[in-house]
Regions:
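Bacterial N-terminal signal peptides
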Residues: 11-24
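A short beta-strand motif characteristic of beta-propeller blades
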Residues: 29, 66-76, 111-117, 152-158, ...
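Beta-rich, blade/repeat-based domains predominating
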Residues: 31-44, 75-90, 118-131, 160-171, ...
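Conserved beta-propeller blade signature
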Residues: 46-48, 92-94, 133-135, 173-176, ...
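Short loop/turn segments immediately following the C-termini of beta-strands
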Residues: 52, 98, 139, 179, ...
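A short loop-to-beta-strand structural motif that recurs across blades of beta-propeller domains
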Residues: 56-59, 102-105, 143-146, 183-185, ...
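Short loop/turn segments that connect beta-strands within beta-propeller blades
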Residues: 60-64, 106-111, 147-152, 187-192, ...
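Blade-level signature of beta-propeller repeat domains, shared across WD40, Kelch, NHL, RCC1
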Residues: 251, 256-285
Length: 285
């Protein structure tokens, strides 16, 4: 009986601790994006942002942000470590998450549906071909996987050293940003890769966009720049310096490039002339 007060105090302390811990696993709504890594844009001019720190996904429409999906702080829950976004051939949003080792498709209810049952490692980038197949750059195992449009078991497409970003061009050829000996690769008709840019001209390439003319734009995080790679020419800086601070994600919207930069505290837009501008976050009420 003498131990009862101590026991009761211990139980009370444990209750408070567990309540506090559990509360920490449920993210409070963020006032604005905290650490944006990925970006995607659909045909309706909506822009989507992967927020690694919140964690979750924001949607920007008419220049204003709203929360599309908020994940949990609990590890191995959907989008706890969201890293990349893409739009599929039907206009649906895709997201890659390393916490659950999976990629997701968002339904009409804005809820993510897993597509591979956790059979991936670290999905860094997703690209979709004209047939609707999903291609995933898996940084953990240095492979690119092909996933059926409806989901299913990933099939090995290629082994590439440290694949960071993927994109398809208008000819349905897959381009890959690699951190291997050749940093920019492209798959031919036989699915074998050739070096578009031999060697390592970039500091830390992290994203790629290819326009209708076959010109590639490569986001370079450490160089605080976006490079332009035209056919038969060496890479040239297309935009560099402020407002670019630590650019990691990039997507096309019309003739412009939209850049996700976790340290810029806003959306960066680069026009066709290479002029970059920053729009501060505006969250819809």
């Amino acid at each position: 009986m003498r131990q009862f007060p101590r026991t009761r105090a211990a139980v009370a302390w444990a209750t408070v601790f567990l309540a506090t811990f559990s509360a920490g696993l449920t993210s409070a709504p963020a006032a604005q994006p905290l650490y944006v890594l990925g970006i995607a844009a659909d045909s309706a001019s909506n822009v989507y942002l992967a927020d690694r720190e919140m964690p979750g996904v924001w949607r920007m429409s008419d220049g204003k942000l709203s929360l599309l999906f908020q994940g949990s702080k609990k590890f191995r829950t959907p989008l706890n470590a969201v890293r990349c976004l893409a739009i599929d051939h039907q206009g649906k949003l895709l997201a890659g998450d390393s916490a659950t080792r999976d990629i997701y498709r968002f339904g009409d209810d804005n809820q993510p549906v897993p597509l591979t049952k956790g059979q991936l490692g670290i999905p860094m980038s997703i690209a979709v071909n004209k047939a609707g197949d999903l291609f995933v750059a898996d940084l953990e195992v240095h492979r690119i996987f092909k996933v059926p449009s409806a989901g299913g078991e990933p099939a090995l497409f290629a082994q590439v050293q440290a694949p960071r970003a993927l994109a398809f061009d208008h000819e349905d050829r897959l381009w890959v940003v690699s951190h291997g000996k050749d940093q920019l690769l492209r798959a031919g008709a036989d699915d074998k890769f050739e070096a578009v840019v031999p060697g390592r001209p970039f500091e830390f390439p992290s994203a790629i966009v290819v326009d209708e003319q076959g010109t590639a734009f490569v986001c370079d995080t450490y160089a605080k720049a976006v490079w332009k790679v035209s056919s038969g020419k060496p890479p040239e800086k297309f935009a560099s310096g402020a407002p670019l601070v630590s650019p990691v994600g990039m997507v096309r919207q019309g003739a412009d490039l939209l850049v996700a930069d976790p340290r810029a505290k806003g959306l960066i837009r680069i026009d066709a002339a290479g002029k970059a501008s920053l729009s501060a976050w505006t969250v819809a009420e």
